[in-house]
């Protein structure tokens, strides 16, 4: 999850998973994994900031885990976001409004990561029922990490996995699930790619709508409609035609 970085070096999803892992051995394991991933995949300054925020989150988990307040639904996400902000606010003050917007989005992702991770790691059914989209958010994190690998000519093999996930959701599930899932996956790809555009979100959502409405239940037609919708959306936007066709 440390590889699923946004805005040039933030790793909020890894920090959220540290918080979701709680105190004790599981929390230590998450901290070690996130720290190792940060050192391997992030710029050095961001790796240090991620490590510092992770240590603060783990320490706060150990300090508060036996309190009633800790069991409240909103406490852990706010705790993780607060610990991350306590490290990042110095850099926000230095870099100005643009960095503040990036940091705010990273804090939101950290809180969502903590909420989804706790639901996924929970042993009780109630937590999973309250957060039915938690597995989707973790899947999104993995897809963002996979799509961060790019070849010299811009080809990212991980984006094929994201498009396959959108196609499967559109084919197997109803529009109430498939379209929000496609939009979230597209937003994750846009955040990971940087640049401030929402091309992936728009094209994935459009393709999910088209497949779900016109060809759901027919594998060949679903694949053809999906490919056509991606081509119609991407090629007029000066996308690299060879890469689009390869995807």
Language-model segments: what does each one mean?
Residues 1-180, 184-247:
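Membrane-embedded alpha-helical hairpins and interfacial helices in multi-pass inner-membrane proteins
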């Amino acid at each position: 999850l440390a590889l699923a970085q946004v805005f040039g070096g933030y790793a909020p999803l890894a920090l959220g998973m540290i918080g979701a892992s709680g105190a004790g051995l599981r929390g230590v394991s998450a901290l070690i994994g996130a720290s190792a991933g940060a050192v391997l995949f992030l710029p050095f300054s961001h790796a240090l900031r991620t490590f510092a925020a992770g240590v603060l989150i783990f320490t706060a988990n150990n300090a508060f885990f036996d309190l009633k307040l800790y069991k409240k639904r909103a406490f852990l996400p706010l705790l993780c976001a607060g610990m991350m902000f306590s490290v990042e606010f110095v850099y926000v003050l230095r870099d100005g409004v643009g960095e503040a917007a990036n940091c705010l989005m990273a804090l939101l992702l950290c809180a969502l990561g903590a909420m989804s991770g706790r639901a996924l790691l929970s042993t009780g059914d109630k937590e999973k029922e309250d957060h039915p989209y938690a597995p989707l958010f973790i899947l999104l994190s993995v897809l963002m990490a996979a799509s961060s690998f790019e070849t010299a000519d811009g080809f990212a093999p991980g984006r094929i996995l994201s498009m396959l996930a959108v196609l499967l959701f559109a084919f197997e599930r109803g529009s109430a699930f498939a379209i929000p899932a496609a939009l979230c996956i597209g937003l994750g790809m846009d955040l990971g790619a940087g640049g401030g555009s929402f091309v992936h979100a728009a094209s994935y959502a459009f393709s999910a709508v088209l497949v779900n409405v016109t060809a759901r239940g027919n594998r060949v037609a679903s694949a053809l409609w999906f490919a056509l919708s991606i081509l119609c959306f991407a090629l007029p936007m000066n996308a690299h035609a060879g890469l689009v066709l390869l995807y």
